[in-house]
Amino acid sequence: MYLSRTELDPARRSTMIALTSPQKFHGAVENSFSGERRRRLWRLDSLNGKLYLLLLSEELPDLTGLCAQFGTGAAPETRRYEPLLERVTSGSCWQFRLTANPTRARKDPADPLARGALKPCYLEAEQEQWLLEQAGKHGFALTEGAFQVTRKQTCHFRKNGKRPVTLLAVTYEGILQVTDPEAFREMLCQGIGRGKAYGLGLMTILHGGRSHG
């Protein structure tokens, strides 16, 4: 697998438009590959005052088009992902960042037997609880106080120019501890939660930190 980073130019009109419509970035990401369509994870990230698009993919991407459309002219960076995955061991602690779409099933009081419809978690307490629940499913542990919500954004756009879509994007940062390396590696590669086509679900990790509790 490959993890790529492309610096974006937020002053360009094309980038401004894409920042309000993730469908634009999704299309550019898909056009970076030839052949069969596969799941790719991507995310917008800010670091030291610069804006980047991170991309995790099975195949080596051709980022020429994406750079031409949204970039600053700086060459993109790409590296193999396997060396990081190999460092994931049971009990290891990592700093993490995740932008995800936390949702919860809400039952209809008029039909209590029906499966509840998935609705966004707008309350911060619910957003934190969602991540705590996801941790148990994906091979890592969190404790309250070891992570926080650092950003929230609601994005409205039309899918394929037709159906209206509303996505809640919540960014989490903190320290986690790996409890099941295999499940954790799978989550890193496959993503977490909904909205993956629109820049959600990619967790990035940096070795460091220590367990809380």
Protein language model features and the residues they cover:
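RNA-interacting cores
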Residues: M1-G213
